[in-house]
Amino acid sequence: MYLSRPTGVARFAASSSSSSSASLFPGVDVDTTTKTGALHFEETKERIKKLFDKVELSVSAYDTAWVAMVPSPNSLNQPLFPECINWVLDSQHADGSWGLLHNDQLLMKANLLSTLACVLTLKRWNIGHDHMSKALDFIKSNIASATDENQRSPVGFDIIFPGMIEYAKDLNLNLPLAPTNVDALVRKKELELRSCRSNSEGGKAYLAYVSEGIGKLQDWDMVMQYQRKNGSLFNSPSTTAAAFMHRNDDGCFDYLRSLLQKFDGSVPTIYPLDIYARLHMVDSLQKFGIARHFKEEIRSVLDETYRCWMQGEENIFLDASTCAMAFRMLRVEGYDVSSDQLTQFSEDIFPNCLGGYLKDFGASLELYKASQIITHPDESVLENINSWTSRFLKHGLSSDSVWSDRTDSVVKQEAVNALEFPYNATLERLISKRAMESYSGDIVRISKSPYACLNFGHQDFLELAVEDFNTLQRIHLKELEELQRWVVENKLDELKFFRLHLGYCYFAAAATLTDPELHDARIAWAQNGVLTTVVDDFYDGGGSEEELDNLIELVEKWDPDGEVGYCSKDVEIVFLALHSTVCEIGRRALVWQGRSVMRNVIDGWLALLKVMRKEAEWSTNKVVPSMGEYMEQAHVSFALGPIILPMLFFVGPKLSEEMIGSCEYQKLYKLMSTAGRLKNDIRSYDRECKEGKLNILSLWMIDGGGNVTKEEAIEAIKGDFERAIRELLGLVLQENTTIPRACKDLFWKLMSIVNLFYMEDDGYTSNRLMNTVKAMFEQPMDLDALLNK
């Protein structure tokens, strides 16, 4: 929409045509119409793919006005960038204001800031008197918002807005403001300045960032220390314009000129933002569970980000959020990035930068998430960041408000999720479900002024995610029915000693292996999960010694009609279920692997049964093993071996005998199983202690000779758990190893589901987990409800 100029108002000639639009993104058609019918899945995907091509930023009236104020070096009475003045003339809203069109009533401070900046521009060049009159009416009507603590405040508002009021006096512009309003604003500015100047390096960075509000009193030598390679100050057009007016710096001029060439008569509030915006987009697609549809585009973004990382790109390392996101996403995808680059964000150094001074909640959240990707034993910088950010986030959640470029409710909910579900206890389907349920549609951020970017969370992300989630849910329900038939056909429901937890077992598979084509892997995971629970219950009191030995002998011979025979109906049911299931897995795996894997799977089961038999003997004979002896058996008896191996055959890569027998495979398996066993033993200690069962916690206290308390033992075991998962993650993320990455990922995912299950109780008794399982299978996502909540 173009706004007409009053008749007779002069217009500056610009070197290039200028245009304006009420749309956040001129020239970009943003369809926000709710689709109630079937989604055109491929069309939605294509629209999202186009977002990778270009980062679209909204125009900032505030920053454009400051650039418009810059005089020509040849004549102080002529503007250097007349096209910006034309944009200001064209872009006033009907209510007399300038600024981003939005529905947030808490952004009135931003509107006041942008409107006053545009008024100063017009007054500076003695043009647009009718525009100014309408704008002054707007300011007069809304000035109360300037001191309203409930309003979202642009960065530096308490310095910049009073500073512009003082500048208006220099221009002989009479603002319709009551002296009491002006005095209150000036007092806030003075308090803010005193606070900044007493805060060393962080305060200096902040004062430099809001230089336009300080004007002639600014220490411009100090400000120019923050100049970047692209000539800007903080990638901020307004700060850079103010610096150029006072220092006539060539770098500042080159930056401003390049912006005008790119954005055709107007500027955004921050530029460049490409790296951050694209990383944020990738992160959003991953959280929504639809990243697999954009593998090539995501790889391209990460390759480019890694190139910039290795070149020391300022736009990564001078921004905490960007640096933290880049580190996390690159490391998780196997790129070699050092945590040393995050030293600048440790607790004692972070306050020295702008984000640290602002106590940026969003940046701290990104740093917290990055700090969890520890893959080496000596990454103390990540431990430091994890410690202070977790404390900072928890404190922020208990306070009324935090500072962030996003709305409080959105960023706080993300923090709640991040703290409650750390990286080592996350499941893809649960993450995507939470992302959809918390979708706000808010693509607006606030810096010195509000700005919008489609890459931050286009509605198409939600539409594609909902369709994808519901499609997978239908697949999962069919697979669950298949598994229910399998239970009945194999008579597992007739076993009296058995805790049937089919829903949990399949939930673990479905929430982790989300690709539709991974049907065989999900079925194998669930079936073997059920069967390991069967044999665990059988060897944990459900069977006699004769039955336990009988089952082992049957598996060794692997002949259901052989001479061994069955000493009981329970043994017959267990063995025949195991035999038929393993044989079916072998038939399916032959298609994927091109070779028989039956022996591998059988050997895995045999190893588990023998270890469980050994532990049953310990229990019967009241043997108290050493901690080393216990863990050597217990990591196997945790029963992940028969689950993980069959899955690996169904995820794509071909696994040779040499790979399965490699030291790397054994290490992955042992680390995963050890971590799971330690977590299980901590959670189940009280119950197992009452039942007289062995547990690493009780053995630790026994080994301490009575000098180790339960709490001390728990802390020690937690330390062992953390070391195990760090080493596991490091091995999973390591490139160019024997085991393919797609297979290594399953070790981490299986460990994560175990960790999640044992975050509360013993994994099977949590009501919240039970409700989560039911919701994932029974509740489809409703797009209209999500958009209209």
UniProtKB/Swiss-Prot annotation:
Pathway: Plant hormone biosynthesis; gibberellin biosynthesis. Binds 3 Mg(2+) ions per subunit. Abundant in most tissues. Present in low amounts in mature cotyledons. PANTHER family: ENT-COPALYL DIPHOSPHATE SYNTHASE, CHLOROPLASTIC, ENT-KAUR-16-ENE SYNTHASE, CHLOROPLASTIC. It comes from Cucurbita maxima. This is Ent-kaur-16-ene synthase, chloroplastic. It comes from the Eukaryota. Its cofactor is Mg(2+). Gene3D superfamilies: 1.50.10.160, Farnesyl Diphosphate Synthase, Terpene synthase, N-terminal domain. Catalyzes the conversion of ent-copalyl diphosphate to the gibberellin precursor ent-kaur-16-ene.
